[in-house]
Amino acid sequence: DGLAHPFGSQDIIRRMTDLIAKRVCQAVRKASRTGEIRDKIRHALLDLYPTTQEVVDRVASEAAQKPGVPAVRHVVVPYDFDGALNGKKTGRPVPSTKGRALNWGINYLDPRTEVVGFYDAESRPHKDVLLYVGYRRMMDPEKSRVLQGPVFQVRNFYQMTPFCRIAALYQAVAHDWYLPWLFRTLPFVGGTNVFIAHDLLREVGGWDCHVLTEDLEFGTRAYLLRGAWPEYLPYSSSEQTPPTFKAFFRQRLRWGTGHLQVVDKVLTYKDVERSAQRRLRLSLIIKGQLEWVLYQLATFVPPIAMVLHHQDLMDATLVPAAGQWMLSGFSAIYLGFTFYAFRRYSAHLDNSCCPNSWLGRFCVYMGLFLLPLAAFMFPVPYTSALVLKSMGKEPKAWVKTPRTEETRAVS
């Protein structure tokens, strides 16, 4: 007997909803006429979607009020800082580089610091990486002075052009599978997902603020001066890849030019065993200039063969049928592997930017079929660095890589 009639309850709820909606609409119309709503929305957006700097400042202020909580510091590099470790202010503007900023930040480290981790602003490290770093530091502090992990630059996958998507996938494959082997021949250090002993940073003089690849330069210098060879860190971090070919080319051109700078610098260190310098320089040349040229030459083989065949200058029957089937099979394997890489690293993608329509998702998959053209373009920035350096026109200024906007979380 005490139960209300369902239709009566629904009618009450409907009337209440209409009443509330009308009052809200009236308030919004009134506020829009007076301009009051503009300020309210602006303040609401600033509170809901803070910038990275605002979040850091907020966390730093909260941590400062709690005893026993790790300190958070947010520092700005002075415009006139000379860039050297323990350097000085010159009173005049100094070009900005990543190495310069890192050296300024080292000054704010707690003297008790044993190891320093480096990440980019948009990095998302593995949640267990610090546990592993601490474990290695306790088990073998000498061999774990430099720990370098893989970086999967695929998170803004859906915001990239098709070429950059393919490049990002194969960059992730290289870091995932090839990086452990690379450590057998090169003391490779990347600029992110790397942990370096604090005392080693001080002993070798911090980061070089003049070369374009301060990370690779640090790895070679730490090895030659202190015998510190990087160890593979089996925990990945996800980041972004430049979304357009222009930005991609500029970043890779900087990497290639920086590599050439390191090759030239390796022999300039004093009080270092000359044989070690020569061996390291040879390894850098093999992994750099030689591989770039061979890869670029290999990309010319298919188009040259097509032109020769079209001009009746090459007989296709010279290749046995089994060989032709094998070549066709390789093409299918490469395309299949590209789709496998897409699925393998899908957990690291920002899926909030994935197209909602089936047509949009279909276009993403179809873009992966541009692999043959993309593969031709992969080595172009590096061979361009070779050509420009030979002409004395290589880039000399460090340029920050543009980032794409990511989904913002409510703080």
Which ranges hold each PLM region?
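Active-site donor/metal-binding and catalytic loop motifs
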Residues: L233-A247
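Juxtamembrane "helix exit" motif at the C-terminal ends of alpha-helical transmembrane segments
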Residues: Q296-P320
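Juxtamembrane C-terminal module of membrane proteins
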Residues: A21-K22, T268-R281, Q311-S411
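Long helical/loop segments within the catalytic core of UDP-sugar-dependent glycosyltransferases
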Residues: A64-L109, T113, K127, V133-L212, ...
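Active-site-proximal specificity loops/subdomain of glycosyltransferases
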Residues: H5-R23, A27-A31, G35-I37, I41, ...
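A short, conserved beta-strand element in the Rossmann-like catalytic core
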Residues: R124-P125, E217, S238-E239
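Short beta-strand-to-loop acidic/aromatic patch adjacent to the donor-nucleotide binding site
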Residues: R112-R124
